[in-house]
């Protein structure tokens, strides 16, 4: 199940990561006239601490909702027992894929000619703890939103609601849930702080 979810989300996640990496570095090094190293550090901060896990979970939510509904139709209220752990694992792995894609996009967009030095600076700015937390956060976000969505869709099917409307409703509810989880995470569980990378 996790493998099927990953295959469905892999391509869009890679594309989203590349677009984010290219966009952030081009903006920072172009109109904002920042150094190449600062641009990459900004990209790392955005991907790992601010927008990465939530953006990834939202993208996966939109792609996987029809499959989650299908499992609820087949398995009823028991669907979450297999879907939720699978979604959590997929969320963590996709976060790693998203991070690599964003970093590749950032390096490609960098105006610096020394590619080896660019990669060295990039790796120097990545803290393993931050990467692990981002993967954990993405897994928790996607797992919880999967549980919520399947529980709500099971209730809707009992009331004989239209499946298309159920998917639409859960996309909206999932977005709100993700925003609330993000708010709790950055204010209570893991407040945002800036850590200087080694020189």
Residue ranges and their predicted role:
Residues 36-39, 62-75:
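Transmembrane helix boundary and interhelical loop/hinge segments in multi-pass membrane proteins
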Residues 1-7, 160:
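Cytosolic juxtamembrane amphipathic/interface segments immediately preceding
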Residues 68-85, 160-163:
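Short cytoplasmic-facing helical segments at TM-TM junctions of multi-pass membrane proteins
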Residues 8-30, 176-188:
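Hydrophobic alpha-helical transmembrane segments of multi-pass membrane transport/permease proteins
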Residues 92-109, 147, 175-185:
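Bilayer-spanning, highly hydrophobic alpha-helical transmembrane segments
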Residues 27-51, 101-143, 147-169, 192-199:
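Membrane-interfacial helix-loop-helix connectors in multipass membrane proteins
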Residues 46-65:
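Long, hydrophobic alpha-helical segments
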Residues 10, 14, 64, 80-101, ...:
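Selective transmembrane-helix segments that form parts of the transport pathway or gating/packing helices
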């Amino acid at each position: 199940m996790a493998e099927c979810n990953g295959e469905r989300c892999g391509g869009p996640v890679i594309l989203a990561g590349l677009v984010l990496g290219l966009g952030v570095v081009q903006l920072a090094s172009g109109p904002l006239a920042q150094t190449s190293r600062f641009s990459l550090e900004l990209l790392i901060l955005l991907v790992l601490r601010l927008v990465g896990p939530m953006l990834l979970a939202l993208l996966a939510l939109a792609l996987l909702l029809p499959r989650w509904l299908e499992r609820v139709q087949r398995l009823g209220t028991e669907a979450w027992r297999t879907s939720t752990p699978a979604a959590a694992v997929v969320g963590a792995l996709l976060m790693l894929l998203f991070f690599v894609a964003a970093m590749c996009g950032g390096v490609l967009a960098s105006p610096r000619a020394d590619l080896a030095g660019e990669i060295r600076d990039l790796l120097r700015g990545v803290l393993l703890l931050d990467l692990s937390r981002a993967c954990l956060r993405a897994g928790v976000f996607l797992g919880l939103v999967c549980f919520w969505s399947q529980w709500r869709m099971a209730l809707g099917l009992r009331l004989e609601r239209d499946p298309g409307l159920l998917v639409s409703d859960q996309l909206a509810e999932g977005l709100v849930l993700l925003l609330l989880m993000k708010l709790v995470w950055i204010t209570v569980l893991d407040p945002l702080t800036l850590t200087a990378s080694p020189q």
